Amino acid sequence: MMKKCPSELQLEAFIREEAGAGDRKPGVLSPGDGARKSGLFSPGDGEMSVLDQSTLDGSGGGHQLWWPESVRTPPRAAAAFSATADERTPASISDDPKPTTSANHAPESDSDSDCDSLLEAERSPRLRGTKSTETKRIRRMVSNRESARRSRRRKQAQLSELESQVEQLKGENSSLFKQLTESSQQFNTAVTDNRILKSDVEALRVKVKMAEDMVARAAMSCGLGQLGLAPLLSSRKMCQALDMLSLPRNDACGFKGLNLGRQVQNSPVQSAASLESLDNRISSEVTSCSADVWP
């Protein structure tokens, strides 16, 4: 059911009031009579109802309409108004809905075509913008892949170079470790040799001290002889010294009787042993003499 405009509702209320005025007794005024006599429009009780064509035309039985001069319309306007009312009644809409729908759909189709054209016009730059953005995205993706591939290759080359350097360093480390082992062995041998040399030096020092003592003793004996202490020695010691220094006659005679060849035949070992024994005897005698001099 179509919604009615306010003017139609007011018109129906006016017609309903007029129909009710015909049913009332003469001499009784309704609330809208003064308004009709003064030429004003009164909506009546405000009830909403739909009247048929006979009521609108005033031809219905017992429904005689009274139109004031101020509200009365010309015949042409009344005919046009009646035609408009017929078109807007629910009966006319229910009887012939096809022309109305076709009339309503015709401008809608035109408006739809216009909207489609406008949408296509709006979509065309959007589509172009979308294509451009898609192209940019694809190019960016390709460039990113290329850069990633180049970076992977660079990293692979760096990794291989580092691996070769590691292998080289490992070889150098092994060679240096071997050299360190050899050096440690040499150091150990040097330490051992140093200890041996130190012991040899100590032994030589002891020997040097012994030699110095012997030299001092010899010098002391020589000094005693030079100072004239020899006469102070006892006769016994002196005799012993003379007996030690003097040669026996038999030996002297023997030396006289010996020839040169026999003397040459004596071995140097025997001569060295005799000299050593002689030296020992001299040193012992000198020591005993010095002890007698300095008790």
Curated annotation (Swiss-Prot):
Keyword Lipid metabolism: no
Highest taxon, organism lineage: Eukaryota
Gene3D superfamilies in alphabetical order: 1.20.5.170
SMART domains: BRLZ
Induction of its expression: Induced by cold stress in roots.
Region annotated Disordered, chain positions: 16-157
Domain bZIP: 134-197
Record's keyword terms, sorted: DNA-binding, Nucleus, Stress response, Transcription, Transcription regulation
Compositionally biased tracts (Basic and acidic residues): 16-26, 120-136
Keyword Cytoplasm: no
Biased amino acid composition, Acidic residues: 109-119
GO CC aspect terms: nucleus
Biological function: Probable transcription factor that binds to the DNA specific sequence 5'-TGAGTCA-3' found in seed storage protein gene promoters. May function as a negative regulator in cold and drought stress responses.
Protein name: bZIP transcription factor RISBZ5
Organism, scientific name: Oryza sativa subsp. japonica (Rice)
Biological classification of the source: Eukaryota, Viridiplantae, Streptophyta, Embryophyta, Tracheophyta
The gene coding this protein: RISBZ5
